[in-house]
Amino acid sequence: GGKEGYPLNSSNGCKSGRFAGTNSNENTECKGXDAENGY
């Protein structure tokens, strides 16, 4: 992880929170922040 991610229910399926999980797309698609969690 290390990138800020979108919520799990978003179109790209990334994990929520400041540190995205082991999603294969985390470095290319988990950009921006998770507004709901204030990141």
Swiss-Prot record:
Expressed by the venom gland. InterPro entries: LCN-type_CS_alpha_beta_dom. Residues 3-39 form the LCN-type CS-alpha/beta domain. Keywords: Disulfide bond, Ion channel impairing toxin, Neurotoxin, Secreted, Toxin, Voltage-gated sodium channel impairing toxin. Transmembrane segments: none annotated. It comes from the Eukaryota. It is found in: Secreted. The keyword Zinc-finger does not apply. GO terms for molecular function: ion channel inhibitor activity; sodium channel regulator activity; toxin activity. One of its GO terms (cellular component) is extracellular region. Residues 1-39 are annotated as: Disordered. The keyword RNA-binding does not apply. Residues 28-39 have a biased composition (Basic and acidic residues). Beta toxins bind voltage-independently at site-4 of sodium channels (Nav) and shift the voltage of activation toward more negative potentials thereby affecting sodium channel activation and promoting spontaneous and repetitive firing. Has the structural arrangement of an alpha-helix connected to antiparallel beta-sheets by disulfide bonds (CS-alpha/beta). Belongs to the long (4 C-C) scorpion toxin superfamily. Sodium channel inhibitor family. Beta subfamily. This is Putative beta-neurotoxin. It comes from Tityus pachyurus (Colombian scorpion).
